[in-house]
């Protein structure tokens, strides 16, 4: 992820020249807001990094189902290890690892862009732009966790479908003229598009609360059901 960020940061300084007079490309990039084409490009790049990082987080959550279907979870849970602790150990990897992944992408982008532009103030600016997506990413982690606890047989398909939906909305939503009501279903649409937009505190706080609620739902659901996917009565 750091190297992907480096690539984005490398291009950022030349994006005005690369786009040139291509109005179509300018319009697509400008849809991400900002007072300059460079900021719009950086906002789009950071969003892409966040979506890539979400893939890592979802895969980490889906390891829970993989352990269960491979019959490796049952021997562990037959010991005094509580179910919620077993799930929490996997969630710690997904939640904590996703922060590291996003930070690496933002750091790579900011460091490269800052060095090329002789402005290392871009490092904290773009690092913060990446980390502001953590709540949206965690919401999808919560969604996958809730599915694992309630309807485990469909968790993989539904979790990846949710990410694919967010990807289409985030990258192509404006181009495809997706209705706002549909686009708003993506948590990433409620995250400030830094550095093009101003920071708003309320959306990340609300997204974090929803993510926490979904994780609790998943933990409670897993406690009530049998291993293998059946639900206890």
Predicted regions and their residues:
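Extracellular/periplasmic helix-exit of transmembrane alpha-helices
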Residues: 4-23, 54, 104-115
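A structural motif at transmembrane helix-loop-helix junctions in multipass membrane proteins
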Residues: 134-168
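Terminal transmembrane helical anchor/hairpin motif
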Residues: 7-33, 158-233
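Membrane-interface alpha-helices at helix entry/exit sites of multi-pass transporters
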Residues: 82-95
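Long, hydrophobic alpha-helical segments
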Residues: 40-64
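Transmembrane helix boundary and interhelical loop/hinge segments in multi-pass membrane proteins
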Residues: 58-77
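Secretory targeting signals
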Residues: 92-145, 205-208
């Amino acid at each position: 992820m750091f190297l992907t960020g480096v690539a984005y940061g490398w291009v950022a300084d030349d994006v005005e020249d690369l786009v040139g007079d291509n109005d179509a490309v300018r319009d697509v990039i400008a849809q991400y807001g900002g007072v300059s084409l460079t900021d719009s490009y950086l906002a789009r790049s950071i969003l892409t990094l966040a979506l890539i990082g979400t893939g890592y987080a979802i895969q980490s959550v889906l390891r829970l189902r993989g352990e269960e279907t491979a019959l490796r979870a049952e021997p562990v849970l037959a010991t005094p290890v509580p179910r919620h602790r077993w799930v929490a150990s996997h969630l710690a990897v997904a939640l904590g690892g996703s922060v590291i992944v996003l930070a690496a992408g933002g750091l790579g982008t900011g460091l490269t862009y800052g060095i090329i532009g002789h402005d290392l103030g871009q490092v904290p600016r773009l690092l913060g732009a990446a980390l502001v997506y953590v709540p949206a990413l965690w919401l999808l982690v919560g969604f996958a966790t809730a599915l694992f606890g309630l309807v485990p047989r469909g968790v993989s398909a539904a979790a990846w479908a949710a990410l694919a939906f967010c990807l289409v909305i985030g990258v192509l939503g404006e181009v495809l003229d997706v209705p706002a009501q549909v686009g708003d279903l993506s948590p990433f649409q409620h995250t400030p598009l830094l550095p093009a937009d101003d920071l708003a505190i309320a959306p990340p706080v609300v997204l974090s609360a929803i993510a926490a609620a979904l994780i609790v739902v998943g933990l409670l659901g897993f406690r009530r059901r049998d291993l293998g996917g059946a639900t206890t009565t």
